[in-house]
Protein backbone atom coordinates (compact mmCIF):
# COMPACT_ATOMS: atom_id res chain seq x y z
CA UNK A 1 0.00 0.00 0.00
CA UNK A 2 1.27 3.46 -0.91
CA UNK A 3 0.75 6.60 1.16
CA UNK A 4 0.78 10.04 -0.44
CA UNK A 5 0.79 13.47 1.19
CA UNK A 6 -0.69 16.15 -1.03
CA UNK A 7 1.55 18.68 0.70
CA UNK A 8 4.75 16.90 -0.38
CA UNK A 9 6.65 18.86 -3.06
CA UNK A 10 6.95 15.78 -5.26
CA UNK A 11 3.32 14.65 -4.81
CA UNK A 12 2.24 15.23 -8.42
CA UNK A 13 5.23 13.35 -9.83
CA UNK A 14 4.82 10.42 -7.45
CA UNK A 15 1.04 10.32 -7.93
CA UNK A 16 1.37 10.29 -11.73
CA UNK A 17 3.91 7.47 -11.56
CA UNK A 18 1.49 5.51 -9.38
CA UNK A 19 -1.35 6.01 -11.86
CA UNK A 20 0.85 4.94 -14.76
CA UNK A 21 1.74 1.61 -13.18
CA UNK A 22 0.33 -1.38 -15.03
CA UNK A 23 -1.81 -3.53 -12.77
CA UNK A 24 -1.59 -7.24 -13.25
CA UNK A 25 0.71 -9.06 -15.63
CA UNK A 26 -1.55 -10.78 -18.16
CA UNK A 27 0.26 -13.35 -20.24
CA UNK A 28 0.80 -12.61 -23.89
CA UNK A 29 -2.14 -14.67 -25.06
CA UNK A 30 -2.86 -12.92 -28.34
CA UNK A 31 -1.11 -15.45 -30.58
CA UNK A 32 -2.85 -18.39 -28.92
CA UNK A 33 -6.21 -16.63 -29.15
CA UNK A 34 -5.69 -15.88 -32.84
CA UNK A 35 -5.32 -19.60 -33.51
CA UNK A 36 -8.48 -20.44 -31.58
CA UNK A 37 -10.51 -17.83 -33.43
CA UNK A 38 -9.32 -19.00 -36.84
CA UNK A 39 -10.04 -22.64 -36.00
CA UNK A 40 -13.61 -21.87 -34.92
CA UNK A 41 -14.12 -19.62 -37.95
CA UNK A 42 -13.02 -22.30 -40.41
CA UNK A 43 -13.99 -25.53 -38.64
CA UNK A 44 -17.05 -24.42 -36.68
CA UNK A 45 -18.58 -26.78 -34.16
CA UNK A 46 -15.84 -29.41 -34.57
CA UNK A 47 -13.20 -26.96 -33.35
CA UNK A 48 -15.47 -25.75 -30.57
CA UNK A 49 -16.04 -29.26 -29.24
CA UNK A 50 -12.35 -30.11 -29.59
CA UNK A 51 -11.34 -27.10 -27.48
CA UNK A 52 -13.91 -28.09 -24.85
CA UNK A 53 -12.29 -31.51 -24.63
CA UNK A 54 -8.75 -30.11 -24.51
CA UNK A 55 -9.23 -27.11 -22.24
CA UNK A 56 -12.30 -27.93 -20.15
CA UNK A 57 -11.98 -31.74 -20.06
CA UNK A 58 -15.61 -32.27 -21.07
CA UNK A 59 -16.94 -34.31 -23.97
CA UNK A 60 -19.83 -32.42 -25.53
CA UNK A 61 -21.74 -32.88 -28.76
CA UNK A 62 -23.73 -30.51 -30.94
CA UNK A 63 -26.81 -31.89 -29.18
CA UNK A 64 -25.59 -31.56 -25.57
CA UNK A 65 -23.79 -28.22 -25.77
CA UNK A 66 -27.01 -26.31 -25.15
CA UNK A 67 -28.41 -26.03 -21.63
CA UNK A 68 -31.95 -27.40 -21.70
CA UNK A 69 -35.05 -25.63 -20.45
CA UNK A 70 -35.36 -28.37 -17.83
CA UNK A 71 -31.84 -27.64 -16.55
CA UNK A 72 -32.64 -23.94 -16.28
CA UNK A 73 -35.80 -24.69 -14.33
CA UNK A 74 -33.98 -27.15 -12.07
CA UNK A 75 -31.21 -24.65 -11.35
CA UNK A 76 -33.71 -21.94 -10.51
CA UNK A 77 -35.58 -24.31 -8.19
CA UNK A 78 -32.32 -25.33 -6.49
CA UNK A 79 -31.48 -21.70 -5.72
CA UNK A 80 -32.30 -20.74 -2.09
CA UNK A 81 -35.52 -18.77 -1.72
CA UNK A 82 -33.83 -15.66 -0.32
CA UNK A 83 -31.43 -15.57 -3.27
CA UNK A 84 -34.29 -16.01 -5.76
CA UNK A 85 -36.11 -13.16 -4.05
CA UNK A 86 -33.00 -10.96 -4.20
CA UNK A 87 -32.53 -11.79 -7.90
CA UNK A 88 -36.11 -10.80 -8.67
CA UNK A 89 -35.75 -7.62 -6.60
CA UNK A 90 -32.52 -6.67 -8.38
CA UNK A 91 -33.91 -7.47 -11.83
CA UNK A 92 -36.96 -5.29 -11.25
CA UNK A 93 -34.82 -2.35 -10.18
CA UNK A 94 -32.37 -2.80 -13.07
CA UNK A 95 -35.31 -2.99 -15.47
CA UNK A 96 -36.88 0.17 -14.05
CA UNK A 97 -33.62 2.14 -14.12
CA UNK A 98 -32.75 1.17 -17.68
CA UNK A 99 -36.30 1.72 -18.94
CA UNK A 100 -35.79 5.42 -18.22
CA UNK A 101 -32.87 5.45 -20.66
CA UNK A 102 -35.06 4.80 -23.71
CA UNK A 103 -34.49 7.65 -26.19
CA UNK A 104 -37.19 9.05 -28.44
CA UNK A 105 -37.21 9.09 -32.22
CA UNK A 106 -37.07 12.58 -33.70
CA UNK A 107 -38.57 14.05 -36.88
CA UNK A 108 -38.88 17.64 -38.12
CA UNK A 109 -38.94 19.77 -41.24
CA UNK A 110 -36.27 22.45 -41.42
CA UNK A 111 -36.35 25.92 -42.96
CA UNK A 112 -35.35 24.55 -46.37
CA UNK A 113 -38.26 22.12 -46.33
CA UNK A 114 -36.08 19.03 -45.80
CA UNK A 115 -37.63 16.33 -43.63
CA UNK A 116 -34.99 15.20 -41.13
CA UNK A 117 -34.77 12.96 -38.12
CA UNK A 118 -33.51 9.75 -36.67
CA UNK A 119 -34.93 6.57 -35.30
CA UNK A 120 -33.62 4.08 -32.77
CA UNK A 121 -33.72 0.34 -33.40
CA UNK A 122 -32.53 -2.52 -31.18
CA UNK A 123 -29.83 -4.97 -32.17
CA UNK A 124 -31.17 -8.28 -33.41
CA UNK A 125 -28.90 -10.62 -31.44
CA UNK A 126 -26.54 -10.18 -28.49
CA UNK A 127 -24.18 -12.63 -26.82
CA UNK A 128 -23.55 -12.48 -23.08
CA UNK A 129 -20.36 -14.04 -21.70
CA UNK A 130 -20.71 -15.22 -18.09
CA UNK A 131 -17.47 -16.48 -16.48
CA UNK A 132 -17.41 -19.77 -14.63
CA UNK A 133 -15.90 -20.85 -11.32
CA UNK A 134 -15.70 -18.30 -8.52
CA UNK A 135 -16.60 -15.51 -10.94
CA UNK A 136 -19.93 -17.10 -11.96
CA UNK A 137 -22.09 -14.32 -10.61
CA UNK A 138 -25.86 -14.05 -11.09
CA UNK A 139 -25.46 -10.27 -11.02
CA UNK A 140 -23.37 -10.52 -14.22
CA UNK A 141 -26.33 -12.12 -15.98
CA UNK A 142 -28.76 -9.46 -14.75
CA UNK A 143 -26.56 -6.45 -15.50
CA UNK A 144 -25.89 -7.59 -19.07
CA UNK A 145 -29.11 -9.32 -20.09
CA UNK A 146 -31.78 -7.10 -18.53
CA UNK A 147 -30.70 -3.90 -20.36
CA UNK A 148 -30.61 -5.87 -23.62
CA UNK A 149 -34.10 -7.10 -22.90
CA UNK A 150 -35.31 -3.58 -22.08
CA UNK A 151 -33.76 -2.32 -25.33
CA UNK A 152 -35.84 -4.83 -27.29
CA UNK A 153 -33.08 -7.17 -28.47
CA UNK A 154 -34.78 -10.12 -30.20
CA UNK A 155 -32.28 -12.80 -29.21
CA UNK A 156 -29.99 -13.01 -26.18
CA UNK A 157 -27.53 -15.90 -26.24
CA UNK A 158 -25.53 -16.65 -23.10
CA UNK A 159 -22.30 -18.63 -22.99
CA UNK A 160 -20.65 -19.93 -19.84
CA UNK A 161 -17.89 -22.51 -19.29
CA UNK A 162 -19.01 -26.15 -19.03
CA UNK A 163 -19.21 -28.02 -15.80
CA UNK A 164 -21.62 -27.67 -12.92
CA UNK A 165 -23.61 -24.53 -13.67
CA UNK A 166 -24.26 -22.33 -10.66
CA UNK A 167 -27.97 -22.60 -9.79
CA UNK A 168 -28.15 -18.87 -9.01
CA UNK A 169 -26.77 -18.06 -12.47
CA UNK A 170 -29.54 -20.15 -14.03
CA UNK A 171 -32.09 -18.48 -11.77
CA UNK A 172 -30.84 -15.08 -12.93
CA UNK A 173 -31.03 -16.18 -16.56
CA UNK A 174 -34.61 -17.28 -16.07
CA UNK A 175 -35.48 -13.98 -14.38
CA UNK A 176 -33.87 -12.05 -17.26
CA UNK A 177 -35.74 -14.09 -19.86
CA UNK A 178 -32.62 -15.78 -21.26
CA UNK A 179 -33.54 -19.18 -22.65
CA UNK A 180 -30.57 -19.73 -24.98
CA UNK A 181 -27.57 -20.84 -22.91
CA UNK A 182 -24.52 -22.65 -24.26
CA UNK A 183 -22.02 -24.53 -22.10
CA UNK A 184 -18.86 -23.24 -23.68
CA UNK A 185 -16.28 -20.75 -22.41
CA UNK A 186 -13.00 -19.07 -23.24
CA UNK A 187 -11.91 -17.52 -26.52
CA UNK A 188 -13.65 -20.33 -28.40
CA UNK A 189 -17.02 -19.25 -26.96
CA UNK A 190 -16.44 -15.67 -28.09
CA UNK A 191 -15.51 -16.95 -31.55
CA UNK A 192 -18.66 -19.09 -31.71
CA UNK A 193 -20.81 -16.06 -30.90
CA UNK A 194 -19.05 -13.96 -33.53
CA UNK A 195 -18.85 -16.45 -36.40
CA UNK A 196 -21.45 -19.03 -35.48
CA UNK A 197 -20.62 -22.69 -34.85
CA UNK A 198 -23.05 -25.51 -35.53
CA UNK A 199 -26.24 -24.81 -33.58
CA UNK A 200 -24.85 -21.51 -32.22
CA UNK A 201 -25.92 -18.73 -34.57
CA UNK A 202 -23.78 -15.56 -34.79
CA UNK A 203 -24.70 -12.42 -32.86
CA UNK A 204 -24.26 -8.72 -33.55
CA UNK A 205 -22.57 -7.77 -30.28
CA UNK A 206 -20.81 -9.52 -27.39
CA UNK A 207 -20.90 -8.24 -23.82
CA UNK A 208 -19.76 -9.55 -20.47
CA UNK A 209 -16.50 -9.96 -18.53
CA UNK A 210 -13.88 -12.66 -18.86
CA UNK A 211 -10.25 -13.60 -18.39
CA UNK A 212 -7.28 -12.49 -20.51
CA UNK A 213 -8.21 -14.96 -23.28
CA UNK A 214 -11.79 -13.72 -23.47
CA UNK A 215 -10.66 -10.10 -23.49
CA UNK A 216 -8.10 -10.77 -26.22
CA UNK A 217 -10.75 -12.55 -28.29
CA UNK A 218 -13.14 -9.62 -27.96
CA UNK A 219 -10.39 -7.20 -28.96
CA UNK A 220 -9.55 -9.23 -32.07
CA UNK A 221 -13.18 -9.73 -33.08
CA UNK A 222 -14.19 -6.09 -32.78
CA UNK A 223 -15.42 -5.19 -36.24
CA UNK A 224 -16.75 -8.67 -36.92
CA UNK A 225 -19.09 -7.95 -34.02
CA UNK A 226 -19.55 -5.09 -31.61
CA UNK A 227 -18.22 -5.39 -28.06
CA UNK A 228 -19.05 -3.60 -24.84
CA UNK A 229 -15.55 -2.83 -23.55
CA UNK A 230 -12.19 -4.35 -22.64
CA UNK A 231 -12.60 -4.76 -18.91
CA UNK A 232 -9.65 -4.46 -16.55
CA UNK A 233 -9.28 -5.08 -12.80
CA UNK A 234 -11.86 -3.52 -10.47
CA UNK A 235 -11.30 -0.10 -8.90
CA UNK A 236 -12.72 2.02 -6.11
CA UNK A 237 -11.88 5.43 -4.68
CA UNK A 238 -13.41 6.41 -1.34
CA UNK A 239 -13.41 10.06 -0.33
CA UNK A 240 -14.11 10.14 3.41
CA UNK A 241 -13.77 12.42 6.41
CA UNK A 242 -13.21 11.49 10.05
CA UNK A 243 -16.94 11.42 10.84
CA UNK A 244 -17.11 7.96 9.24
CA UNK A 245 -16.75 4.65 11.04
CA UNK A 246 -13.28 3.44 9.94
CA UNK A 247 -14.55 -0.14 9.75
CA UNK A 248 -17.23 0.87 7.24
CA UNK A 249 -14.69 2.52 4.98
CA UNK A 250 -12.34 -0.45 5.34
CA UNK A 251 -15.14 -2.75 4.19
CA UNK A 252 -15.81 -0.53 1.17
CA UNK A 253 -12.17 -0.61 0.13
CA UNK A 254 -12.02 -4.38 0.56
CA UNK A 255 -15.21 -4.83 -1.48
CA UNK A 256 -13.21 -4.24 -4.65
CA UNK A 257 -9.87 -5.60 -3.43
CA UNK A 258 -11.41 -9.05 -2.96
CA UNK A 259 -12.21 -9.34 -6.69
CA UNK A 260 -8.66 -9.72 -7.91
CA UNK A 261 -5.06 -9.28 -6.70
CA UNK A 262 -4.78 -6.65 -9.45
CA UNK A 263 -7.81 -4.65 -8.21
CA UNK A 264 -7.19 -1.18 -6.82
CA UNK A 265 -8.64 0.54 -3.75
CA UNK A 266 -7.75 4.14 -2.88
CA UNK A 267 -8.71 6.20 0.16
CA UNK A 268 -8.69 10.01 -0.02
CA UNK A 269 -9.05 11.74 3.34
CA UNK A 270 -7.88 14.91 5.03
CA UNK A 271 -7.22 13.24 8.40
CA UNK A 272 -4.06 11.15 8.97
CA UNK A 273 -5.37 9.63 12.19
CA UNK A 274 -8.55 8.52 10.44
CA UNK A 275 -6.47 7.03 7.61
CA UNK A 276 -4.45 5.05 10.15
CA UNK A 277 -7.67 3.79 11.75
CA UNK A 278 -8.95 2.61 8.36
CA UNK A 279 -5.66 0.83 7.66
CA UNK A 280 -5.90 -0.94 11.01
CA UNK A 281 -9.51 -1.94 10.32
CA UNK A 282 -8.44 -3.40 6.97
CA UNK A 283 -5.72 -5.42 8.66
CA UNK A 284 -8.24 -6.81 11.16
CA UNK A 285 -10.82 -7.67 8.50
CA UNK A 286 -8.24 -9.44 6.36
CA UNK A 287 -7.64 -11.92 9.18
CA UNK A 288 -11.11 -13.44 8.77
CA UNK A 289 -12.22 -12.50 5.25
CA UNK A 290 -12.84 -15.60 3.13
CA UNK A 291 -11.42 -13.77 0.12
CA UNK A 292 -8.59 -12.37 2.22
CA UNK A 293 -5.73 -13.74 0.14
CA UNK A 294 -6.74 -11.85 -3.00
CA UNK A 295 -7.84 -8.79 -1.04
CA UNK A 296 -4.57 -8.63 0.89
CA UNK A 297 -2.52 -8.87 -2.31
CA UNK A 298 -4.58 -6.14 -3.94
CA UNK A 299 -4.28 -3.78 -0.97
CA UNK A 300 -0.58 -4.49 -0.55
CA UNK A 301 0.39 -4.09 -4.20
CA UNK A 302 -2.08 -1.56 -5.57
CA UNK A 303 -3.82 0.14 -2.65
CA UNK A 304 -3.20 3.75 -1.70
CA UNK A 305 -4.02 6.34 0.93
CA UNK A 306 -3.92 9.98 -0.13
CA UNK A 307 -3.88 12.63 2.59
CA UNK A 308 -5.22 15.77 0.96
CA UNK A 309 -7.67 18.62 1.57
CA UNK A 310 -11.09 17.30 0.62
CA UNK A 311 -11.59 20.24 -1.71
CA UNK A 312 -8.81 18.72 -3.84
CA UNK A 313 -10.60 15.37 -4.12
CA UNK A 314 -12.57 16.08 -7.34
CA UNK A 315 -9.37 16.83 -9.24
CA UNK A 316 -7.69 13.73 -7.79
CA UNK A 317 -10.69 11.58 -8.72
CA UNK A 318 -10.63 12.95 -12.26
CA UNK A 319 -6.95 12.09 -12.56
CA UNK A 320 -7.67 8.52 -11.42
CA UNK A 321 -10.89 8.25 -13.52
CA UNK A 322 -12.01 5.27 -11.41
CA UNK A 323 -14.63 2.66 -12.03
CA UNK A 324 -16.35 3.56 -8.73
CA UNK A 325 -16.04 6.51 -6.35
CA UNK A 326 -17.75 7.03 -3.01
CA UNK A 327 -18.14 10.42 -1.33
CA UNK A 328 -18.78 9.37 2.27
CA UNK A 329 -19.47 12.88 3.51
CA UNK A 330 -22.22 15.24 4.57
CA UNK A 331 -23.52 17.20 1.58
CA UNK A 332 -21.41 15.09 -0.80
CA UNK A 333 -22.75 16.85 -3.90
CA UNK A 334 -20.62 19.89 -3.13
CA UNK A 335 -17.63 17.81 -4.24
CA UNK A 336 -19.14 15.09 -6.45
CA UNK A 337 -20.74 17.63 -8.78
CA UNK A 338 -17.22 18.70 -9.76
CA UNK A 339 -16.20 15.18 -10.82
CA UNK A 340 -16.05 14.63 -14.56
CA UNK A 341 -14.43 11.20 -14.92
CA UNK A 342 -15.94 8.28 -12.98
CA UNK A 343 -17.89 5.19 -13.94
CA UNK A 344 -20.35 5.52 -11.05
CA UNK A 345 -20.61 7.86 -8.06
CA UNK A 346 -22.04 6.84 -4.68
CA UNK A 347 -23.12 9.62 -2.35
CA UNK A 348 -23.31 9.75 1.43
CA UNK A 349 -22.25 7.60 4.35
CA UNK A 350 -24.82 4.83 3.83
CA UNK A 351 -24.44 4.31 0.07
CA UNK A 352 -21.67 1.72 -0.28
CA UNK A 353 -20.56 0.75 -3.76
CA UNK A 354 -21.85 -2.79 -3.14
CA UNK A 355 -25.40 -1.45 -3.45
CA UNK A 356 -24.57 -0.52 -7.04
CA UNK A 357 -23.11 -3.95 -7.71
CA UNK A 358 -26.45 -5.58 -6.99
CA UNK A 359 -29.69 -3.75 -6.35
CA UNK A 360 -29.52 0.02 -6.86
CA UNK A 361 -30.66 -0.46 -10.45
CA UNK A 362 -27.73 1.32 -12.09
CA UNK A 363 -25.39 -0.89 -14.08
CA UNK A 364 -22.27 -2.39 -12.53
CA UNK A 365 -20.56 -2.92 -15.90
CA UNK A 366 -18.35 0.17 -15.77
CA UNK A 367 -15.19 1.50 -17.43
CA UNK A 368 -11.89 0.55 -15.78
CA UNK A 369 -8.22 1.40 -16.30
CA UNK A 370 -8.99 5.15 -16.59
CA UNK A 371 -11.42 4.54 -19.46
CA UNK A 372 -14.02 6.62 -17.59
CA UNK A 373 -12.30 9.58 -19.28
CA UNK A 374 -14.03 8.63 -22.53
CA UNK A 375 -16.48 5.82 -21.86
CA UNK A 376 -19.73 5.21 -19.97
CA UNK A 377 -21.06 2.17 -18.17
CA UNK A 378 -23.25 -0.39 -19.90
CA UNK A 379 -26.74 0.87 -20.73
CA UNK A 380 -29.50 0.30 -23.24
CA UNK A 381 -27.50 2.54 -25.59
CA UNK A 382 -25.16 -0.44 -26.00
CA UNK A 383 -28.04 -2.45 -27.44
CA UNK A 384 -29.64 0.08 -29.78
CA UNK A 385 -28.45 2.06 -32.77
CA UNK A 386 -29.52 5.33 -34.36
CA UNK A 387 -30.37 5.64 -38.05
CA UNK A 388 -30.56 9.05 -39.74
CA UNK A 389 -33.60 9.88 -41.89
CA UNK A 390 -33.54 12.45 -44.75
CA UNK A 391 -36.28 13.30 -47.27
CA UNK A 392 -36.26 16.07 -49.89
CA UNK A 393 -39.01 17.23 -52.19
CA UNK A 394 -38.17 19.09 -55.43
CA UNK A 395 -38.30 22.48 -53.73
CA UNK A 396 -36.01 21.55 -50.84
CA UNK A 397 -33.63 19.68 -53.15
CA UNK A 398 -33.32 22.83 -55.24
CA UNK A 399 -31.92 24.52 -52.11
CA UNK A 400 -29.50 21.73 -51.13
CA UNK A 401 -28.48 20.46 -54.56
CA UNK A 402 -26.22 23.30 -55.78
CA UNK A 403 -24.22 23.28 -52.55
CA UNK A 404 -23.84 19.51 -52.85
CA UNK A 405 -22.47 19.92 -56.37
CA UNK A 406 -20.00 22.62 -55.28
CA UNK A 407 -18.61 20.57 -52.39
CA UNK A 408 -18.40 17.36 -54.42
CA UNK A 409 -16.44 19.13 -57.17
CA UNK A 410 -14.14 20.69 -54.56
CA UNK A 411 -13.38 17.20 -53.25
CA UNK A 412 -12.73 15.82 -56.72
CA UNK A 413 -15.69 13.44 -56.71
CA UNK A 414 -17.48 13.99 -60.02
CA UNK A 415 -19.99 11.16 -59.64
CA UNK A 416 -21.14 12.69 -56.35
CA UNK A 417 -21.62 16.00 -58.13
CA UNK A 418 -23.41 14.29 -61.01
CA UNK A 419 -25.78 12.48 -58.66
CA UNK A 420 -27.00 15.87 -57.45
CA UNK A 421 -26.76 17.92 -60.63
CA UNK A 422 -28.87 15.55 -62.76
CA UNK A 423 -31.77 16.22 -60.40
CA UNK A 424 -31.53 19.99 -60.65
CA UNK A 425 -33.71 21.82 -63.17
CA UNK A 426 -30.60 22.72 -65.20
CA UNK A 427 -29.65 19.04 -65.50
CA UNK A 428 -25.95 18.11 -65.79
Curated annotation (Swiss-Prot):
Example GO BP: L-histidine biosynthetic process
One Gene Ontology cellular component: cytosol
Sites where the protein binds NAD(+): 129, 188, 211
Needed co-factor(s): Zn(2+)
Keyword Cell membrane: no
Enzyme class: oxidoreductase
Positions with a binding annotation for Zn(2+): 256, 259, 357, 416
Enzyme Commission number(s): 1.1.1.23
Binding site for substrate: 234, 256, 259, 324, 357, 411, 416
Cofactor descriptive note: Binds 1 zinc ion per subunit.
Matches recorded under CDD domains: Histidinol_dh
InterPro entries: Ald_DH/histidinol_DH, Histidinol_DH_CS, Histidinol_DH_monofunct, Hstdl_DH
GO molecular function: histidinol dehydrogenase activity; NAD binding; zinc ion binding
Active-site residues, as the UniProt record annotates them: 323-324
Keywords for the protein's UniProt record, in alphabetical order: Amino-acid biosynthesis, Histidine biosynthesis, Metal-binding, NAD, Oxidoreductase, Zinc
Catalytic activity: L-histidinol + 2 NAD(+) + H2O = L-histidine + 2 NADH + 3 H(+)
Pfam family, any one: Histidinol_dh
Pathway participation: Amino-acid biosynthesis; L-histidine biosynthesis; L-histidine from 5-phospho-alpha-D-ribose 1-diphosphate: step 9/9
Task of the protein: Catalyzes the sequential NAD-dependent oxidations of L-histidinol to L-histidinaldehyde and then to L-histidine.
Family: Belongs to the histidinol dehydrogenase family.
Database matches in PANTHER family: HISTIDINE BIOSYNTHESIS TRIFUNCTIONAL PROTEIN (PTHR21256:SF2), HISTIDINOL DEHYDROGENASE HDH (PTHR21256)
Name of this protein: Histidinol dehydrogenase
Gene for this chain: hisD
